[in-house]
Every structure is written in C-alpha cells, then in structure tokens.
Amino acid sequence: MGLPLVPGNGSGAVLAANVGLSFWGGIDPTDGTVIDQSHPLCGQSVAGKVLALPSGRGSCTGSQVVLELLLGGKAPSGLLLSQSDEIIPLGVIVGEELFGRSLPIVRLSEADFAHACSSAHARIGADGSVHLSDAVATDSDSASDAHTPTRVTDAELAEHIQMRSDDLATLGGAHGAAAQVAMRILLRVARLQGVRELLDVTQVHIDGCTYIGPASLRFAQQLLAWQGSFKVPTTLNAISVDRRRWRALGVSPVLGEPASALGDAYVALGAQASFTCAPYLLESAPCAGENIGWGESNAVVYANSCLGARTQKYADFLDACIALTGRAPAAGCHLDAGRRARLVLRLDPCLQARVLGAGGALDDAFWPTLGYLVGLKAASRVPVLTGLEQVAPSRDDLKAFSAAFGTTASVALFHLAGITPEAPTLKTALGLSTGSTAHAVDQADQATIGQLDVAQITLSLEDLVQAYATLNGHVTGTESAAALTDKAGGVTGSVLDGQAIELVALGNPHFSVEECARLAEMLASSLQPRHEGVSLVITLGRATLEEARRRGYVQPIEAFGATLVTDTCWCMLTEPVVPPTARTIITNSAKYAHYGPGLVGRRLRFANLAGCVEAATSGRAPTGQPSWLAKSIGSTRAMHVGRYARTARGVRTIL
C-alpha cells in the first residue's frame, strides 16, 4: 500500500529506473519517448507503461509535458515514486481540473519501490494499493483499468487548511472562474504537501509561457476566456521564439504563431513582457526573506540560494495559479525547516588543494561543473558544500552553478559555506546557530553533525573529472571516470579534442550585462575573424540587451558576426536558429550540455567562455583540459583559462 498522490486506477508493464527524470528535456511530449541521453531509460517509451522513478528532477516544465502526454494519449498508465514530487502530479491535477483527464500516481516506501522496479507488471488501485507480478497482463486487461477522475469537492479541499475569508470567497467563485479554478489547484497541491495554510507572495515568475504543445496554449487561453487577471506583479520566462524577430530568423509559423500566442495570452492576463529565464537580473529581483512564487528551475535555485528569497520550485501552471490568487502553499523553502541543509558535502584534501591552488586559473567552467556534480549528489536533499570559503565567485559564477545544480537535483536550494547568504558557517546552514560573521570558516565537529539526520559525502577529484567529462561529451554511461583520469589525477587526452564545431551556443541561462562586456572584450581583442563555418548565437533578455547596447558592448559582438536573440533561450531553440548543417555544438552552459543532445539531436561539447570564443574563430573544439583538472596547475596542456593575449593565431589564453 502506498500514498495516492493522485488517486485512480491503472495498470501496465513496469518501466523502471533508480535515477530521477526531468519530464521536460527528458521525454518527447509528442510520443512519450525518453530523450535524455544521460538517462538509463533513453530510447524507451513511457506510453501505456507504469513508470517507476524515485522522483522527477530538473525543469519546472515537466508538468507541461505531463499534460501534453495526457491530452495526446501518450501518457504512462500510472506513476510510482519513492520521493516527494509536486511537478509531475501538478500536470495530472491540471488535466483533471480543466480537461477531465488523469492517471494515478502513488508514492511508495523505498522497499516497496525497489520491489516494483524488479517487477514486470503493476496494477494500481484508487486507494493507493499496488499489485505487482512477474507476468505482463494483456492490453485488454490494462485498458479495463482506465478510469474517469472523481471530482474533489470544495469542502474536502478546504477541510484541513486554514483559509482566510478572501480565500473562501475565491474558492466560491466571487473573483471569477479563473481565480476559482486556480484556488482549487492550489488547495489540491497544498493537500498533497500536507500544508495547513497558505501565505501571501509579493511577485511571481511564470515558467509556463514556454510552448511545447497545444495543451499549454489551451490552458492560458481558458484563463483568458474566464477573464482572469493576475493579482501580483508577474514576470515571464523565456518563451519558445524571439517574439519580435521569429519570422526574420526563419522560424516556421507552425511554431512561431502558437508560441507567440501563448506569450501574448500571459501578457493579457497581466504579466510583464520580460521574457527572460534570469529574472534575478531584473530590477524587480526579490530581497532576502521575501516570499515569492517563481517557476524556472535555475531562477528558483538562484533566488533561494543566492538571494535568500523564499520560493518552492513551482511547476508550470501552478505559477499562474499563484499569480491569479497571490497565494501559495506554506511549505518547502518558504519555511525555515525546509531551508536547513540535510546533506554535508566536503571537498577531499586533494580536490580542495587543487581548487585553491588554481587561484586565478579557476575559470568559469569550474562553477557549472561543480554545480552539476553537487546536484547529482544532493538529489532531493538540501546540501551545504564546505571547502570553498576562501573563494569569491561572481554573480555569473553563481548563476552558472545554480543552473547546473537545478538540472541534476530536484531540490530547490543549496548552501555554499562562507559564500551564500544563509550559510556564513556550516553550523548556520544546518540550523545550529545564527548571527555568525559572514565568510567565517566553521568546521562543525562530527559529533554535532552526527546528532542530526544529516548525511555526509566527500567529493573527490575523480567525481569532478566524471562530471566535466559527461558535460564535454566524453562519457556515454559505461565509461568510468577512472578511465578518463591519468595516474597523476588529471584528465587524459580525448579523441574529441580538436573536433569540428559548427555552432557556439551562449546564454543559458540568459547572458548578463557583465557577460556581454566580457565577450565584447574577448572578441574585440581577437586578431582572427569568426570562422566561416561557425555560427555564434547568444540568447539574452530584452532589458539586458538594451543596457548592453547603451554601454557599447553590443557593437563589437555584432561586428564579429554573432547573432543576439532575445525572448527565448537554448532550451527552446531548434532549427533554423540551430543550423540544419550543424553537427556539433559547443556551449559554456552545463544545463544546455545536459539537455541539448536530446532536444536538438546534436553532439554537445562544453568549455568556458574563452574556449567557446576560440572555437568560434578556429572552427575546432579546444584541446587539452582545464587547469583545475590538469595533472599539475600550470600544465602546458591546460586549456582556455586565464586572460587573453594576442598571438599569431589570434585569441589565445595564458595562465
């Protein structure tokens, strides 16, 4: 017997993995095929199967994919989870509330989940019962389990939640049908989380404006038809096209028109046409302690971790419900208890010495690589990382770390001891002390940590090698990190070194003004032009583009032959912005390096910004490895780190 997150009946062959999966970027919403090339289920279809996963992870847009699968007839027949998850169930809840479509979701104990993963067939009951067998039932048996969702009454929704008079009025329809349905969805999520009350939010960032299929547009247009109106200041995430230039960029009307219509619908509901996946770069960025309702995984992680604002990782559609009501469930990272670290990560002495010894050679590829690794280790636990107290990352470093962390973790918050605002010390991050001096180095003793329900993991150089190699296209899933590491602890050479590059993809998350300045300086100092076979494309928000243009950064970038694209991001861009002839893409984004192969069917390489510029001028991927992974700091084979110098070959880097 499990806990029914969405009650219902369903059965089918079990498709199982012990690794979480982001439905967006991980499953094709048109046919249900797993497309995340790093996932063990890659290439298999979830349609009609009982899908067993620990949880979802990564993108808030997973709820959109669930709804697309439901309405398109390609959804699983049921879902079995072993950990908490709100993104996947939210897609089903919206399907029930607006479209009368559903599938059962049950959370199992770890032991029962392991049993389910080893079974051939599962039958889910509306009471949360799960019957497992080693024999696969016939299609007719599975079809007989399909069910029509039973509507939860308003009284049942309000029964265990403290509601204000205006909440009850909204639930009763006093503020219109859009707000009424939004309140029902909010209360269903609150009940799912065991929440007893709602709280006010000061602002919302909507991730659900990304067009991945007709279901998302139907949702937004229904809110408009009900004359919905957002109650709090609301910004919009990057949409699926450059709203002002998609025709000029050669995008087909098949995508351009519905994607634009979706963005327009949210603007009509009262949102600002910000169209950026980095809302923390806007003047409206929240302050520490401010309760907000944000979607977009990288933005949520950055707001919680680096700004000290408070938000759960709100699924697409739920973000709009919060904007319509100004209310959110009082749970997760909104509460002190949900922000305390429950995993301590330490750098082993070798890795710490290498990182600290790198000094100025600790380039901008380090932070997304580390974020990717920390997210993998953290999964659903809030982590605190120690060992970097003497390092001072920039805002862009933390942006890259947050995006990478949000790609591999399901949790919405991390702490870096001595760096992020709620972790001046390790003990503070664990909730053991307050008021400590910022950047104080605190080695909480093992006995103290041992009294808490806190796991501890040591990160090794080999772990970082594995993460970098995966991002850089070296590892297919069977190749070990040890095989990539030489006896001295550095990355070995690779057949990928010097590989031809046809596209340089920058701006995931959206470029900042400071990144525009760095790129402009690099390109202006280059003695070589852009390679004729390479496209350089940067995505960024409208506000950033305007400020960068005002400061004079845009001219050298455009003079180099780069294309600046606003309103959308690499998570949504396809052909023709991705050239049809491009076979290999290089990026400085760990998020895009992870999702890109599944999204656009190209091979991805990973480098820092300097390495990406080198690829744009040479048409080849950089050779060697970052100095912080080289077998000795200052190795002559260490690649593209440090500052630029003019040489006969044009833009090069020196340590």
Residue ranges and their predicted role:
Residues 2-126, 514-517, 521-599:
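Feature captures the catalytic cores and cofactor-binding loops of soluble hydro-lyases/lyases
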Residues 20, 45-46, 55, 132, ...:
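Intrinsically disordered, low-complexity segments enriched in small residues
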Residues 60, 64-78, 82, 93, ...:
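Glycine-rich, N-terminal phosphate-binding loop and its surrounding beta-alpha-beta segment
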Residues 76-83, 230-235, 276, 384-387, ...:
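Short internal beta-strands
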Residues 136-139, 143-146, 261, 269, ...:
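Extended, charge-rich low-complexity interaction segments
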Residues 250-258, 429-456, 547-567:
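Acidic, Ser/Thr-rich peripheral helices and adjacent loops at domain boundaries
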Residues 90-110, 121-123, 229, 236-326:
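A generic, well-ordered mixed alpha/beta core segment in the N-terminal half of proteins
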Residues 57-60, 84-87, 205-212, 236-239, ...:
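Gly/Ser/Thr-rich loops at beta-strand to alpha-helix junctions
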